[in-house]
Amino acid sequence: MPASSPGHMGGSVREPALSVALWLSWGAVLGAVTCAVALLIQQTELQSLRREVSRLQRSGGPSQKQGERPWQSLWEQSPDVLEAWKDGAKSRRRRAVLTQKHKKKHSVLHLVPVNITSKADSDVTEVMWQPVLRRGRGLEAQGDIVRVWDTGIYLLYSQVLFHDVTFTMGQVVSREGQGRRETLFRCIRSMPSDPDRAYNSCYSAGVFHLHQGDIITVKIPRANAKLSLSPHGTFLGFVKL
């Protein structure tokens, strides 16, 4: 078999290489054209969207006509839903107003003792009070009495810490007003005979309808009663409900 010449073998090798190069070139050109077309399409769509947004901004909305309220179409489509929404909004506003009024009506007064006075002729010891917590103007402490300025339902609480060897001690909380005097509540405690152990507290509480002008007093039905003047041992308080 005759041997091939060197020139013929070189031409055969160069022809496939040239074909590959041509295919790669055409592929690159085709890819570039495709990218350019895609960019043109995207640019066209973007310009179209910008024109649409500009038109909507000038017209005020996609379907809003001149003089038409924004909620009109929704009202026409689902009036029951909007009616329920309006009712809920009104209910929330009413609750907010009632809450504000309710908060304004609250009065609080907490009193602690500053001194005691004893009336030997009536066998009574009275406590002189001072406020340590006060909110509102419905109540006012005046010496040994508390005056009610605002009619309403009140939580009333009272405690006296005794240090006395008298066999029984207690407190009486009374109201005077509208031409009569009445006892709201009373508390009685037995006392130890040993002076070192003669401590006992008397606590009472209740809910009462107090009227403007009522006078509230706390009395210990013993002359020269011995009791604690500490704010955590003896106190008197009112909370309007």
Swiss-Prot record:
Residues 107-241 form the THD domain. Pfam families: TNF. Residues 1-95 form a propeptide. InterPro entries: TNF_CS, TNF_dom, TNF_Ligand_Superfamily, Tumour_necrosis_fac-like_dom. Glycans are attached at residue 115. One of its GO terms (cellular component) is extracellular space. The keyword Protein biosynthesis does not apply. Keywords: Cleavage on pair of basic residues, Cytokine, Disulfide bond, Glycoprotein, Immunity, Secreted. GO terms for molecular function: cytokine activity; tumor necrosis factor receptor binding. It is found in: Secreted. Cytokine that binds to TNFRSF13B/TACI and to TNFRSF17/BCMA. Plays a role in the regulation of tumor cell growth. May be involved in monocyte/macrophage-mediated immunological processes. Belongs to the tumor necrosis factor family. This is Tumor necrosis factor ligand superfamily member 13.
